[in-house]
Amino acid sequence: SQINLTLRNNKYEHELKNDTEIVRLICRLLIKNLPIAYLESFIRNKKRALSFFPKNPKFILTSMGYFSNELFKIWIAEQSLLNKKFCISVHGGHHSNSLFNHPGMFTEIISDTFFSWGWTKNILSSSKLSELKKNKNDYKYNKNETKICFVVYSGNKYSGSISAAPTSTNFLESLDIQKKFFCNINKKLLDNTTIRLREVSKTWELKTFYKNLGINKFSYLETEGLKKLVSKNSLFIFSYESTLFFELLTLNIPSILLNEERFWRLNKSGMADYNNLREVNILYDSFYKLSDFVNNNNLDSINKWWLNDNTQRIKNSFLEKNARSNENYINEWINTIKKNINK
């Protein structure tokens, strides 16, 4: 559908005439900025949704359809009117530890049952992490040379939600911390560093930012798979608690989180988790200390640190609470579905 300016300019105008100027302005801006899916295309989308999705679902579970699929949103609203139960599984990383997370709160509020990966009453092991755990011997990381993969937060330039994550000028400040880290590591390590990012990061021109720091290797989520990425690198450093961080911890691949709390604010539970990770050097909140670690450790000492009993214990405990996996997850899922069948 095309934008219907006549519809948007005139709709509800007569109902606003007695409101204050600020209310009229907000309502006009709202109408003019509503996505086409919610106005011009809504009737057509509703018809498509009701013809595409099941008419009498016995079980409804999603981890992303509620925010990424406009047809699903319409369909699930119709199912809610019929009193169908709607289950949501956590979408990804940092949900459990964030001080405030509007998308996460929205997820928990709209679902009849919310499943976490370990920190709530209702728990459902991640199918993706479980599959990785079952097949972890297929993922071999580089044990011949120290090669760093730095995984960056590729948020949109203009945030569409409110959460304890760096946005706008705060995001630029977080880049300055990364700049200081890369300026403090030796040239050989810098030459052996690959930046992992998403295509959406083009809005920030991140590739140019890292190139100006002397980094010339890049890996995109959309074009390079996990197995190939793992095979090229020996140490992964994350600028945020991403789902990929959980995946590599599950695969037991050396991984470090560089996190300053002023950019990624934590709740009390998250603070406790991060303190434990900090004790065994899986987490750093200082780029100076992290640069010292990578400069003063070779591949052998990195592997020795990673395989240390205490490091492994803390890592496994963190996963059990925040990113649970289960090699027998299929039976776990079957039992969960049986308990939540729509009658």
Each PLM stretch: what is its role?
Residues S1-K134, L244-F245:
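Active-site and donor-binding regions of nucleotide-sugar-utilizing enzymes
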Residues F42-K46, E70-I74, P166-I185, E327-I334:
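Well-ordered, non-membrane alpha-helical segments in soluble/globular domains
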Residues N69-L71, S96-S98, K121-S125, Y158-S159, ...:
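Short, charged/polar "capping" segments at the starts of alpha-helices
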Residues F72-Q79, P103-G104, W204-I215, K268-Y274:
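Short, aromatic/basic amphipathic alpha-helical patches
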Residues K121, T194-L251, I256, E261-R262:
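Donor nucleotide-activated moiety binding/catalytic core segment of transferases
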Residues N122-K128, K143, P166, K211, ...:
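Catalytic binding pocket for nucleotide-activated donors in carbohydrate/polymer assembly enzymes
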Residues S127-K211:
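Conserved catalytic-core segment of nucleotide-activated headgroup transferases in glycan assembly
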Residues L319-K343:
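C-terminal alpha-helical cap of glycosyltransferases
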